[in-house]
């Protein structure tokens, strides 16, 4: 997902300019460090803590080691008290530079927000540090497909080699999943709001393109301001029979959905993975009211436990069993699964290069383009030469009793 970036969401031209490390590099000794950078304050705190719980579980299962190498885990907060629930530009850059300055760094897991990765990726790429995101979906981080901006993704890779991968499908797939669902639900037209972030605006463009392809008329695509007290005047414009809120909870999207539902009670409501959290779904946690939740569907790039069991995914079953043993619940936030696979991918890549697990260049080269037929908690996938997963299945969720409830698998293909 992806999403927010405080201060200047697109201001990344100077990123890494004061970092003197060159591309690549080998860590001396047998002690390696994996950094995690996520927003640990505000509305994204719950999702980020879920990611961390998955990362820690995977590392614990490995005994905090890969071959002869010991692995240290360091968790960083890319949000601030002034900008909670989002990747703060200055803090994100500091986190990336901290990892660069640590000579034992072998991998960096983050950011949660696509806008944050726009900042950290050039810094880390210049230093040759492999980076894996559990949640970025913005297409421009890896390709110049529709939904990206001019100069992307080249400007994020100053070392001219790929060092970044993600374990979730990009937003051309999520846009298609939302459009496919709307078509199946009988939508004739859709009005889109976007939160103006890298994630929200980019996904909105993908939804527009995908909706037109399946014959759903796009009535509008309007940006929202997170600081607005309400969105009644904007919501009054929504006359379509369906609505997509392309944003994240932290950009005031509980209020957005409430106001649209009040202005157009008959409209079917749809949200992306950016609102797939209790802070949005649960009224007890200041989420949307139950009557709004009853007509809202959410797309998430992971599937329900029963679907995993039906497919006979042994990796998924082990994850849920071990997660319950460690944390006391067999029903974790979906982002715990992403966090788990992010760490597993990092560790398995280190294992694959053997004695070169301390060689950043070797690790990055193995991860991007050589990850083939990987059996994982998410299913079997490759990481292509751009750093994208070949997984395309999306889960469709409804909201019941304030919780996301798996409904079905969406089969969709991006453009």
Regions found by a protein language model. Name each.
Residues 22, 46-50, 65-151, 223-229, ...:
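Beta-alpha junction/loop-to-helix N-cap segments that form part of ligand/metal-binding clefts
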Residues 16-19:
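Bacterial signal peptide processing site
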């Amino acid at each position: 997902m992806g999403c927010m970036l405080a201060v200047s969401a697109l201001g990344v031209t100077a990123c890494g300019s004061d970092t003197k490390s060159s591309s690549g590099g080998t860590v001396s000794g047998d002690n390696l460090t994996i950094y995690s950078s996520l927003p640990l304050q505000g509305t994204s705190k719950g999702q980020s803590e879920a990611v961390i719980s998955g990362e820690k579980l995977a590392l614990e299962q490995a005994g905090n080691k890969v071959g002869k190498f010991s692995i240290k885990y360091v968790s960083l907060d890319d949000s601030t008290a002034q900008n909670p629930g989002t990747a703060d530009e200055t803090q994100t850059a500091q986190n990336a530079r901290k990892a660069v300055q640590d000579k034992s760094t072998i991998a960096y897991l983050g950011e949660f927000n696509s806008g944050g990765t726009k900042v950290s990726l050039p810094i880390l790429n210049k230093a040759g540090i492999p980076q894996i995101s559990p949640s970025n979906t913005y297409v421009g981080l890896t390709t110049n497909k529709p939904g990206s901006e001019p100069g992307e993704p080249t400007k994020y890779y100053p070392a001219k080699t790929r060092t970044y991968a993600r374990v979730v499908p990009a937003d051309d797939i999520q846009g298609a999943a939302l459009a496919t669902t709307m078509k199946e639900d009988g939508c004739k037209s859709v009005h889109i709001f976007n939160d103006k972030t890298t994630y929200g605006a980019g996904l909105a463009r993908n939804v527009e393109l995908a909706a037109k392809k399946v014959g759903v008329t796009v009535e509008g695509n309007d940006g929202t301001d997170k600081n607005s007290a309400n969105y009644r005047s904007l919501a009054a414009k929504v006359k379509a029979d369906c609505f997509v809120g392309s944003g994240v909870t932290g950009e005031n999207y509980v209020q957005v959905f409430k106001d649209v539902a009040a202005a157009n009670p008959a409209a079917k409501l749809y949200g992306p993975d950016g609102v797939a959290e209790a802070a949005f779904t649960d009224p007890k946690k200041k989420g949307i009211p139950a009557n709004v939740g009853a007509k809202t569907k959410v797309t998430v790039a992971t599937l329900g436990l029963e679907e995993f069991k039906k497919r006979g995914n042994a990796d998924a079953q082990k994850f849920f069993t071990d997660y319950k043993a460690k944390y006391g619940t067999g029903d974790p936030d979906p982002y715990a699964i992403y966090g788990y696979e992010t760490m597993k991918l990092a560790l398995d890549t280190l294992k694959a290069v053997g004695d070169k697990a301390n060689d950043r260049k070797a690790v990055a080269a193995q991860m991007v383009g050589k990850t083939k037929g990987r059996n994982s908690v998410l299913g079997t996938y490759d990481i292509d030469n751009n750093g994208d997963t070949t997984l395309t299945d999306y889960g469709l969720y409804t909201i019941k009793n304030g919780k996301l409830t798996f409904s079905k698998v969406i089969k969709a293909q991006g453009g």
